[in-house]
Amino acid sequence: MGGVFWIPLRMLEDGQLPGTWAAFGFFSSAAALLAPLAAVRRHFLRRAGPGLVITGLLVGGGPVLFVNSLVLTDVVRALLLFYLTPVWSTILARLVLREAITRWRVIAILLGLAGLLILLDVEQGAPLPRNLGDWIALAGGFTWACASVRLRARPQVHSLESLFACFACGTAVALILALLPFAPLAPLPPWDIIERSAPWVVLIGAGFLVPANFLIVWGARLLSPGRVGLLLLCELIVGAVSAAILADEAFGVREVIGVVFIGGAALLEIARRQPSVKPFPAAL
């Protein structure tokens, strides 16, 4: 999903709709699309319990934080800090789910992060947070790591309920961030810009984010959080290739090496047997 998400964001920003408000539009339109289904499945929503709100805040909050970080810091730094997710996921899975951290997982993470650094051509040292946008990107990656652990720990909650919670709670997070008095975040754009952008926002939110996030949520219920984080690194491969094709950006030897490293990390992880976990009670 993240590998091609830059395309609609760039298109909407060219149309003068800030990314902050685009994120709110994406999530609110997706939540509106899923609302009738949620009403039909209200029994399952009630059975999932109030803990579903926590799941929604984590699953929806991570991507919203990432989109906002793109507005507040350099894209490369936002990507680097957000995609530290495999590290957090592996540590949290060990603490919460008691998954073993094997040497092969460590090798896969190091290989993936090396590919990340090569692909993004980092020349300014370690990706440490330096400004508000950096911290938001880091928080977004950590939030998504928490989300993947929670989804894995509660497989008895159906993906549809988690998906609706993701967009409903993500809408609230996006609105709060859009209204915060951060100077770099743009105010609500004029009505003519909103009206012109609305069809694209609805199409992207309801037509793209809903199926993409359903697959991610469904997979996260079944896979180890660390594995999910490593597989999501492959989004950067899609991003690099799509940027080279559609935006005429460079794709040379360095990019090929980065792609090979990231792909190798994913293949190494897939080749391993997945650990089992003991699910949490549905009330948590």
Role assignments for model-derived ranges:
Residues 1-21, 65, 110, 126-153, ...:
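Glycine-/small-residue-enriched transmembrane alpha-helix faces in small-molecule transporters
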Residues 3, 35, 56, 60-64, ...:
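Hydrophobic/small/kink-forming positions within alpha-helical transmembrane segments
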Residues 25, 79-84, 151-170, 209-245:
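Helix-helix packing/entry segments at the starts of transmembrane helices
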Residues 38-39, 85-110, 237-256:
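C-terminal transmembrane-helix exit sites in multi-pass transporters
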Residues 38-65, 132-140, 188-211, 232, ...:
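Loop-to-transmembrane-helix transition segments
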